[in-house]
Amino acid sequence: MSSVKKLSIAFCYHMHQPVYQLNYDSDYLMPWVRLHTAKHYLPLILEAEKFPNLKQNFNIVPTLTDSIIDFSGNALDIHSALTIKDVKDMTPDDKEFILNNFFDAEYTSMIEPYERFKELFNKRFSENCGIDDFSLQDYADLTALFNLVWIDDSLYKRFPEVLKLLEKGRDYTLKERKRIIDIYRKIAKLFVPACKKFLRDRKAELMISPFYHPILPIMTNIKEAQENLDTVDSTLSDLDMSDDARLQIEAAIKRSEKVFGRKFQGSWMPEMGVSENVLKLLSDFNIKWTIADEGTLSAAMNYNFIRDFDGNLEDPYHLMKPYVSKTTGVNIIFRDSMLSSLINNEYPNYSPEDAARDLYEKIKVIQSKLTTSPDDKHLLTIALDGENCWNNYSYNGREFLDKIYELIENDYSLETVLISEYLEEEKHKKEIDAIKSSSWANRNFQLWIGEPVKNLAWTYLKNVKKDMDNILLSNKKGMNVELARKELFLCEGSDWFWWYGEPNDSGQDHIFDYLFREHLKSIYKYLGEDYPRYLDLPLISTIQPTESSVDFPITPAMTGEFEDTEWESANCVSVPDGPILQGQKLFDKICYCADYDKFYLRLYLSDCIEEDSVNPVLQQMYIYMKNPDRIQTQSPVRLINKTENVSPVMKEKFHNELRVSMTEKKLYPIRFTKAIQDGLWAIQNSERIEIIYKDVIDIAIPFEDLDVRRGDTLEFFFANTNFGIKDAFSPQDIMLSIKRPQ
């Protein structure tokens, strides 16, 4: 039997946040840099203190580094500014913001364990709750607790005051709240020195990224980047930002060398976006290596990696070797996407011990299949985000990481490595002919371009860059070219295009849209020109009702069965897959129409309602409706946003609410309510509402019950819920509309 060959493991963590400022000296509109530094970034880097042989690889995007440095000084975000504000001076808007945003934490691990936080949560999400239902001390305690629970417990030894304040539990003073924010500054101050220490000790390696996290394959060759997309926008065919791609890499190298005191040898391209053009750029800047997804290798080799029922590779050899590009000489290592996905998505559902043991066993399976390899050295790359998954673990994943690192450290046949050191010693790299333009997501860029709203954002960016280039040709005096170019680079970042359109939903899309357009406007300001007025128009449909394309009367048969030709003439809206890591959509398609007397709906159920008949799961959907053509008593949506910022549609008020509840095989009685004074709802007689459930759900509601007269417009939207907890909108963040025929 062949002896086991040593397997090297490269743990790689990507740390990135977009710029949350309107300009370079303003407060941050979102707190995520500050919070993730205390909860994830610094604790992850400090893991190396616990294990003498542990080596980790980190990609810290330059914009994140600068933001962390900013927070180590006097920078504030809206959350921290409100935390250190005297509650006696808080305005109604301040209080509304706190109630809508200071519960943005994972409920099970960050809210429920703390009695006072849980008490405030339950109070906030009780029916008919408003800002005046909370005392000044409630606001003081809520702001304090929100910030305290975002500090990882691994930092308590360095900051014992955090634990004391958590144990106090309530009645926080202004002095204590200011102290909490001061602790955040001290945490931020530790970040860069910790990185430098582990760099010196050869326990960490840092990788470069273009400064503002742009997707370089799109910027350098739009035609290649649009391959394998569902739709291609021909108006973007002339998009070319190759010059900016080069400048963003150059700026990142200069800044990173200044902050960390050394030149980086490796890179993590944003969204693992690589192409031949990108490799050429890296070669030009003497970047020795980059990371890509296993799907990119599969496409380049025209080779499918086959996995067994447990997800283990049948033949891991090709994925466990570093490659060198024949055309550029740049080394490429490819991550095992299955293992990275398990850490991101599956292992949070395990106990830390079981998760670590499962990962260890999968690593050992890979190792066992390499005994017949012709080579002695092999590299397993596990690469993932440094923040997104850890809140779903107990103790922010620290127990899991401690255990897997311990198992590896105690196994003489395994080792963790710094990538540059490994590549320097590896003499048997495989050659690769050409890399196809691809990302970590399905080998294409569908999540950032191709969807109509995303394409519109790219069009805005393309047009503004063209304007800027033309303005610069004038060489007029008074232009601040440096700041204008920074604003342009910032708008080239991938995050804008990730959140625009389908399928992703931040819960704060309206803020991202506002920031994107404001930064584009600032380019013209720094160049001394007026900005084009189209930049005042939101790219996203926030609360603007859609136009009904069918305005003639249709009376469909109420059968609940697919075969019904009348519905073929109705308005239909396809519901895309829901936001990543959120609940599944309840419906694939929604059709609607009207005749002179009734409003009709047909709901096509998605696969998520299929279930084990022994344990049926109750699904709920709310329909909110109003008539914008006349004055009506209206009440707010009474659904809970458990962890998200409030979306614009949730701030609207409506005249009627219909709740539909079902399992796979059973329809429960509907609840029909009408808005009454003081923002309340009263149950109405629903006998005249028809509802049939077989293959689909058919609903017919008399217009009279909705206070919609002939010629009036009915606006409506749907919300999937889990017992009153808002799961997703259908469609996302827009309202549909239809006119009652005259």
List the predicted regions and their residue ranges:
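Active-site and substrate-binding clefts of carbohydrate-active enzymes
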Residues: 4-165, 306-552
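Acidic/polar low-complexity flexible segments
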Residues: 550-551, 622-651, 694, 704-742
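Catalytic domains of cell-wall/extracellular-matrix polysaccharide-remodeling enzymes
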Residues: 243-308, 388-408
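Short, well-ordered beta-strand segments enriched in hydrophobic/aromatic residues
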Residues: 209, 560, 598-607, 697-703
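Structured, charged N-terminal subsegments at the starts of enzyme catalytic cores
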Residues: 178, 182-213, 222-223
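CE4/NodB-like, metal-dependent polysaccharide N-deacetylase domain
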Residues: 230, 234-269, 364-383
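Short, solvent-exposed turn/loop segments enriched in Gly/Ser/Thr/Pro and often Arg
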Residues: 59-64, 210-213, 266-274, 295, ...
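Extracellular/luminal beta-rich ligand-recognition
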Residues: 562, 610-696
